[in-house]
């Protein structure tokens, strides 16, 4: 008998369904869509104007670099400030060197 849910159809497409989907899509694609059309002179001028604009990636890259540099400087300042505070707090505690691992504690 089994569970009722197991008898329901699988809600996700199977590989067979995907193949059928691709076949139906190919029927709607016209053949002349792959032909190349030469742009008119007005369109060529618009393309050249677009090429003259600065690349957004370069502007964004410069902003990210500036932000990263500023953030790194803040991190270094905070670390030095924290080290200075800790150093002042514990400066009078003497440093004890260990004599090595060959000594045993009795």
Curated annotation (Swiss-Prot):
<keyword id="KW-0564">Palmitate</keyword>
<feature type="lipid moiety-binding region" description="N-myristoyl glycine">
    <location>
        <position position="2"/>
    </location>
</feature>
<comment type="subunit">
    <text>Interacts with PKA type I regulatory subunits PRKAR1A and PRKAR1B. Also binds to type II regulatory subunits, but at a tenfold lower affinity.</text>
</comment>
<keyword id="KW-0597">Phosphoprotein</keyword>
<keyword id="KW-1003">Cell membrane</keyword>
<dbReference type="Pfam" id="PF15127">
    <property type="entry name" value="SmAKAP"/>
</dbReference>
<dbReference type="GO" id="GO:0005886">
    <property type="term" value="C:plasma membrane"/>
</dbReference>
<feature type="region of interest" description="PKA-RI-binding">
    <location>
        <begin position="62"/>
        <end position="85"/>
    </location>
</feature>
<dbReference type="GO" id="GO:0034237">
    <property type="term" value="F:protein kinase A regulatory subunit binding"/>
</dbReference>
<feature type="lipid moiety-binding region" description="S-palmitoyl cysteine">
    <location>
        <position position="3"/>
    </location>
</feature>
<keyword id="KW-0449">Lipoprotein</keyword>
<dbReference type="InterPro" id="IPR027969">
    <property type="entry name" value="Small_membr_AKAP"/>
</dbReference>
<comment type="function">
    <text>Binds to type I regulatory subunits of protein kinase A (PKA-RI) and may anchor/target them to the plasma membrane.</text>
</comment>
<feature type="modified residue" description="Phosphoserine">
    <location>
        <position position="98"/>
    </location>
</feature>
<keyword id="KW-0472">Membrane</keyword>
<comment type="similarity">
    <text>Belongs to the small membrane AKAP family.</text>
</comment>
<protein>
    <recommendedName>
        <fullName>Small membrane A-kinase anchor protein</fullName>
    </recommendedName>
</protein>
<keyword id="KW-0519">Myristate</keyword>
<feature type="modified residue" description="Phosphoserine">
    <location>
        <position position="40"/>
    </location>
</feature>
